């Protein structure tokens, strides 16, 4: 549920949406099957339709860009399990398995659409290495029943925010919000805003005892 929320919300057009999914090889088959099952049940349609759960992208141009990015990912070794079709500004919810860690989408190519690229790993250190091999670093998330391991990974991610066992775009107004590397300069949030808008001045009084 959290994976779909983090990827499909607003048709995947969110800056801090979950865009790459790193799954341990021992869980990849089960994870992929569950995601495909959930995604296949999503009703696509217009926002005015109360039963619709997934709308179109912001424009047909944006959908065409997603189409090209998916095609590139397949060319680089990924395999479409479900979806992969465009209809005007609509793009079907898509799952791409077997994505190699050398693929563009595993590094710096961000897909702003309803696409779940699945990249497998063997060890925790390998997962951290793949996650950090990007010039971007806004948000990330970690799913694990091992809290010690989860906090270790969260602290190791080169990003401005990390959510444990939840979608990556969790945000509360009092939290500092910002990224590392190419993902912005500075942070937003109540205290961050106060600090940003506060001008400090030092006044020194000398020779007071003369």
Language-model segments: what does each one mean?
Residues 43, 76, 92-210:
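Conserved C-terminal structural/oligomerization subdomain of aldehyde/semialdehyde dehydrogenase
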């Amino acid at each position: 549920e959290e994976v779909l929320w983090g990827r499909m919300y607003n048709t995947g057009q969110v800056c801090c949406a979950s865009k790459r999914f790193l799954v341990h090889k021992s869980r990849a088959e089960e994870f992929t099957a569950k995601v495909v099952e959930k995604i296949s049940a999503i009703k696509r349609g217009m926002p005015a339709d109360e039963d619709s759960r997934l709308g179109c992208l912001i424009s047909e141009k944006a959908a065409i860009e997603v189409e090209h990015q998916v095609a590139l990912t397949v060319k680089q070794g990924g395999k479409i399990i479900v979806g992969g079709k465009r209809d005007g500004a609509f793009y079907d919810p898509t799952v791409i398995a077997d994505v190699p860690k050398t693929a563009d989408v595993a590094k710096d190519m961000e897909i702003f659409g309803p696409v779940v690229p699945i990249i497998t790993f063997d060890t925790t250190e390998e997962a951290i290495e793949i996650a950090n091999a990007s010039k971007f670093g806004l948000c990330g998330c970690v799913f694990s029943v091992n809290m010690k391991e989860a906090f270790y990974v969260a602290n190791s991610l080169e990003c401005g925010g990390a959510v444990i066992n939840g979608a990556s775009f969790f945000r509360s107004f009092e939290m500092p919000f910002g990224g590392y590397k190419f993902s912005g300069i500075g942070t937003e949030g109540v205290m961050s805003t106060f600090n940003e808008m506060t001008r400090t001045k030092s006044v020194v009084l000398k020779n007071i005892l003369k």
